[in-house]
Amino acid sequence: MFVNRWLFSTNHKDIGTLYMIFGAWAGMVGTGLSILIRAELGQPGSLLGDDQIYNVVVTAHAFVMIFFMVMPIMIGGFGNWLVPLMIGAPDMAFPRMNNMSFWLLPPSFLLLLASSMVEAGAGTGWTVYPPLAGNLAHAGASVDLTIFSLHLAGVSSILGAINFITTIINMKPPAITQYQTPLFVWSVMITAVLLLLSLPVLAAGITMLLTDRNLNTTFFDPAGGGDPILYQHLFWFFGHPEVYILILPGFGMISHIVTYYSGKKEPFGYMGMVWAMMSIGFLGFIVWAHHMFTVGMDVDTRAYFTSATMIIAIPTGVKVFSWLATMNGGNIKWSPAMLWALGFIFLFTIGGLTGIVLSNSSLDIVLHDTYYVVAHFHYVLSMGAVFAIMGGFVHWFPLFTGYTLNDTWAKIHFTIMFVGVNLTFFPQHFLGLAGMPRRYSDYPDAYTTWNTISSMGSFISLTAVILMVFMIWEALASKRTVKSISLTSTNLEWIHGCPPPFHTFEEPAFIKSSH
């Protein structure tokens, strides 16, 4: 029974729960790695050893957080749980493939951990650029294991993407039109398209790297007519859409949370929100070389990538102001989920503004590979993606479990986390402007103050993570059941109660629209 339910599961809710648990566990590992990084940088001098081990930790931190925490929770967890419920489908289109998508991740994670354990580890950064990732600078199996790990995670995501696209296009009941599809469903659909188009390019790039390392090909080796810059183009053609993949489902969740706790029946500018997400998805594919302003591109090429990158700020701004407009005139309920959503809007916007700064190719020459970039992408990921996950988690926790979290603890948790992440990452802007480079385990004494403050912030965030574990335990132990849910007419996922039965929408739903 246990094996049939959890190992051979074909139920979207159970698979979503597995993704959630796996993502939470990986998040603990990633948090531990980030604490190691900040402990090393907390004061000048060496803590862990040389830069190789430091860069192994940094690389593992990036891969764990991206491929094993944010993506499994947002797309695998929330996506699996909510998409079928929101569109009134009985399950995903391919339930067994759904299960395989999940079970490819633990072996992938195992390979990544193995890569750190053998030889000297993969100290390449998450970009895995040759020649540093080649078989001279990184002899041994570490980078090869990392490549195989990425292959498995990539296959998992591609299969998941096919599943979501098929489900969303084909499994809506006739009563739901395209324009009644909830924004979270739209966001997952667009995310799935991005995954489907970008991951094969990454697979090609890392496969060529694998053959360069092991079969003496010279795709990225000038000695045989190859070019390491080709790898950078292939990687970033995946890598830039990837960062939008990480944030788009968050946009969808924030839209639902802001609408719900503003007491509105729909978000402001529904069509504009859909257009904005589609625009971001499209533009995300044509800006990749802004990660490569320092490799010596022509001035006209740099001008194009600068302006194209700045254009993305327009649909993003549409979303931010639509969220604010959704709240306007509403009866706002200051629930923990709403606090996360407001924190998201504020901090994501700050991250977006530093992104606009970095999009200027001339400025980026100076800021590239400094802590300014680290601060920028942690504002959009550590305070964008993670805040969206937290907001979604506390909002839908009653749906997933049938129990309610303690509101007071949840608000305290938000406050600690908010202080922690800002104290960690805001000073890094100053470090970057002062020229402190990334990916070094030590630094000149002049940078000590901001690094010490940053490291203190990371320990505050750690406290918040531990408190969240306590909060979940408290909720599951107290067993406060959900009494009633408001606004179910526009929030279809709640209509079956909390938690919903194992099978939902076994016959096609008819959704009566009031307008």
UniProtKB/Swiss-Prot annotation:
Binds 2 heme A groups non-covalently per subunit. Binds a copper B center. Cu cation binds at residues 240, 290-291. One of its GO terms (cellular component) is mitochondrial inner membrane. The chain crosses the membrane at residues 12-40, 51-86, 95-117, 141-170, 183-212, 228-261, 270-286, 299-327, 336-357, 371-400, 407-433, 447-478. Mg(2+) binds at residues 368-369. One of its GO terms (molecular function) is heme binding. Na(+) binds at residues 40, 45, 441. Fe(II)-heme a binds at residues 61, 378. Keywords: Calcium, Copper, Electron transport, Heme, Iron, Magnesium, Membrane, Metal-binding, Mitochondrion, Mitochondrion inner membrane, Respiratory chain, Sodium, Translocase, Transmembrane, Transmembrane helix, Transport. It is a multi-pass membrane protein. There is a cross-link at residues 240-244 (1'-histidyl-3'-tyrosine (His-Tyr)). O2 binds at residue 244. Signal peptide: none annotated. It catalyses: 4 Fe(II)-[cytochrome c] + O2 + 8 H(+)(in) = 4 Fe(III)-[cytochrome c] + 2 H2O + 4 H(+)(out). Pathway: Energy metabolism; oxidative phosphorylation. Component of the cytochrome c oxidase (complex IV, CIV), a multisubunit enzyme composed of 14 subunits. The complex is composed of a catalytic core of 3 subunits MT-CO1, MT-CO2 and MT-CO3, encoded in the mitochondrial DNA, and 11 supernumerary subunits COX4I, COX5A, COX5B, COX6A, COX6B, COX6C, COX7A, COX7B, COX7C, COX8 and NDUFA4, which are encoded in the nuclear genome. Component of the cytochrome c oxidase, the last enzyme in the mitochondrial electron transport chain which drives oxidative phosphorylation. The respiratory chain contains 3 multisubunit complexes succinate dehydrogenase (complex II, CII), ubiquinol-cytochrome c oxidoreductase (cytochrome b-c1 complex, complex III, CIII) and cytochrome c oxidase (complex IV, CIV), that cooperate to transfer electrons derived from NADH and succinate to molecular oxygen, creating an electrochemical gradient over the inner membrane that drives transmembrane transport and the ATP synthase. Belongs to the heme-copper respiratory oxidase family. PANTHER family: CYTOCHROME C OXIDASE SUBUNIT 1. This is Cytochrome c oxidase subunit 1. It comes from Heterogeomys cherriei (Cherrie's pocket gopher). The lineage of its organism: Eukaryota, Metazoa, Chordata, Craniata, Vertebrata. The gene is MT-CO1.
